[in-house]
Amino acid sequence: MLELNFSQTLGNHCLTINETLPANGITAIFGVSGAGKTSLINAISGLTRPQKGRIVLNGRVLNDAEKGICLTPEKRRVGYVFQDARLFPHYKVRGNLRYGMAKSMVDQFDKLVALLGIEPLLDRLPGSLSGGEKQRVAIGRALLTAPELLLLDEPLASLDIPRKRELLPYLQRLTREINIPMLYVSHSLDEILHLADRVMVLENGQVKAFGALEEVWGSSVMNPWLPKEQQSSILKVTVLEHHPHYAMTALALGDQHLWVNKLDEPLQAALRIRIQASDVSLVLQPPQQTSIRNVLRAKVVNSYDDNGQVEVELEVGGKTLWARISPWARDELAIKPGLWLYAQIKSVSITA
């Protein structure tokens, strides 16, 4: 568990945090440049010192301004991966990985190297590596110090699109197989969608929202970052069954289910899906014959006029689903809070 209750002056703003983060999964730190994202993780790592408050990791006090406690970075057991890999140029990859390696991680070296796909790189110098390869080595080096927490400061920011696509699957594997909580600084919605369990949104040094990805994603706080034509819903689902005759997989959403193209996932596997509001249409009665495989019973929570369109907030199995319809359709269907209807979903994408 990471307890953050501190403040630190940042130019004309003051970074003020009072949140408790669980000791698992990935928490994305999101916001525009200058919001305080990097300043937050620098304070946690010990690179900077808050003027007030406390930072406590798993019961260990890292910083207590009132008591004059401020552990040095090397005593905090916090790993840090920077935007630029910062590898030692005169050490081969193997030497970089072993630099600062904890004794408890010696037996984990081969496993971690395999997990990050860097075994072919062990005898190469950093100067011969691509940007994505360097970042994988940097992540491996940080993990081999046996940290209780891993901080990643926009690790994909300096990479071009092909290198980002190369590194993203390795980060996804880490989230599944390495039981170390991570704080992931980013201003990329795509990275957050694929990696984060939780999101903390910062603005001018203040926390505007903090919670599960699907909750924050559907809140008004995210509206400035979401293009209107890309309004969408993020939902947690589990694998229910694989169709015996067709290459389709059913995903449980409350007491209903969605069909998607067949997934190579075991039953009960937890997944996250994204549904674009523009891919959801509404009907008052379930259609008798339709090519659309996914028709869910839903209740209208509210509706909002938006530049000639209507955003309809629906509840499905205790979760929020958004639909975008025209004012004409809203009036013809008499859309109002509490109305039960059916949502036809034309497309579903798997995010994690």
From Swiss-Prot:
One term under GO cellular component: plasma membrane
Membrane-related topology note: Peripheral membrane protein
Gene3D superfamilies membership: 2.40.50.100, P-loop containing nucleotide triphosphate hydrolases
Entry keyword set: ATP-binding, Cell inner membrane, Cell membrane, Membrane, Molybdenum, Nucleotide-binding, Translocase, Transport
Protein name: Molybdenum import ATP-binding protein ModC
Function: Part of the ABC transporter complex ModABC involved in molybdenum import. Responsible for energy coupling to the transport system.
Subunit structure and binding partners: The complex is composed of two ATP-binding proteins (ModC), two transmembrane proteins (ModB) and a solute-binding protein (ModA).
A single GO molecular function term of this UniProt record: ATP binding
Family: Belongs to the ABC transporter superfamily. Molybdate importer (TC 3.A.1.8) family.
Record's subcellular location: Cell inner membrane
Catalytic activity from the UniProt record: molybdate(out) + ATP + H2O = molybdate(in) + ADP + phosphate + H(+)
Mop domain ranges (all copies): 289-352
InterPro entries named in the record: AAA+_ATPase (IPR003593), ABC_transporter-like_ATP-bd (IPR003439), ABC_transporter-like_CS (IPR017871), Mo/tungstate-bd_C_term_dom (IPR008995), ModC_ABC_ATP-bd (IPR011868), Molybdenum_import_ModC (IPR050334), Mop_domain (IPR004606), P-loop_NTPase (IPR027417)
Location, primary (coarse class): membrane
Cited PROSITE patterns: ABC_TRANSPORTER_1, ABC_TRANSPORTER_2, MODC, MOP
ABC transporter domain segment(s): 1-229
List of residues binding ATP: 31-38
One Pfam family recorded for the sequence: TOBE
Enzyme Commission number(s) of this protein: 7.3.2.5
